[in-house]
């Protein structure tokens, strides 16, 4: 039996309120407008290109079978957002295959540097499959991006430029700070006030910044087996009715892709519906 809750809007609002709760363990930064386009022209929401579904939608605009139901429906299932950082890479095709097989969406917080240039076309493939593309970093070098607020936004501008051939810039609405919004490494390079400044600037510019409350721990240094990755995710999700799961599709996290079918199966068996990060935000609007 699948559990139900009042509405998708109510669940999304709950997630937002949880951002100020220490017990929640993740944060969502809400902004009133979309980010300024690369051209610096007036902010005009751009629909997806012909034939490309919006995030969380399948071909023709139909809902992905595993995605969360629309707010108009009376019931709401427990929600899970699968998110992947640090790709695309050689690991990403296996991640996309698992998502397609299970018919569920995910959100990819991408990087774009000299190490993964040949994999950037996978961004288009992910978007066309109904996944959401979001921003992480061009370089992911803490010493560079966190030396100042200006350096951080220069890195984001470069990332947007590099991925522009593969995704409609007007559809990219979210970002994740490398290390998360509560990271301590930024203090080493930019001072104690830097992250607060960046969060404020992100919201002023229209970006939605996103943390997590469940982690696969697949980028913590130790090489994990697929079983360990799955256990970290499912164990961290037990008892939660809203999950934003941090995983990685970097070149060194192949076991995460191996674990993904089991992870998805566990969430389905527990009655969760799958959605992208922006689906949660859009329910608030």
Each model region followed by its residue ranges:
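Terminal accessory/targeting
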Residues: 1-81, 97-106, 165, 213, ...
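Phenylalanine-focused residue identity feature
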Residues: 5, 26, 84, 108-109, ...
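Active-site beta->alpha N-cap acidic-glycine motif
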Residues: 45-172, 273, 282-283
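Catalytic domains of cell-wall/extracellular-matrix polysaccharide-remodeling enzymes
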Residues: 140-246, 250-266, 272, 279-280, ...
């Amino acid at each position: 039996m699948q559990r139900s809750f009042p509405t998708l809007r109510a669940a999304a609002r709950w997630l937002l309120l949880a951002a100020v709760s220490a017990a929640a363990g993740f944060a969502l930064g809400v902004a009133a407008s979309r980010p300024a386009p690369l051209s610096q022209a007036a902010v005009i929401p751009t629909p997806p290109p012909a034939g490309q579904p919006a995030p969380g939608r399948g071909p023709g605009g139909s809902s992905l079978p595993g995605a969360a139901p629309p707010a108009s429906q009376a019931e709401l299932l427990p929600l899970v957002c699968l998110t992947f950082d640090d790709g695309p890479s050689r690991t990403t095709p296996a991640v996309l295959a698992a998502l397609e097989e299970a018919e569920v969406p995910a959100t990819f917080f991408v990087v774009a540097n000299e190490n993964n240039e040949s994999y950037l076309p996978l961004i288009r493939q992910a978007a066309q499959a109904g996944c959401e593309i979001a921003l992480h970093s061009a370089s992911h070098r803490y010493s560079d991006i966190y030396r100042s607020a200006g350096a951080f936004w220069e890195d984001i501008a470069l990332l947007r430029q590099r991925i522009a051939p593969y995704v409609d810039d007007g559809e990219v609405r979210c970002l994740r700070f490398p290390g998360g919004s509560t990271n301590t490494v930024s203090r080493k390079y930019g001072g104690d006030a830097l992250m607060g400044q960046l969060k404020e600037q992100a919201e002023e510019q229209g970006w939605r910044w996103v943390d997590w409350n469940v982690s696969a721990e697949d980028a913590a240094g130790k090489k994990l087996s697929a079983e360990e990755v799955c256990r970290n995710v499912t164990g961290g999700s037990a008892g939660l009715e809203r999950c934003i799961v941090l995983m990685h599709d970097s070149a060194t996290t192949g076991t995460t892709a191996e674990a993904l079918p089991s992870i998805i199966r566990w969430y389905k068996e527990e009655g969760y519906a799958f959605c992208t990060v922006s689906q949660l935000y859009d329910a608030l609007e």
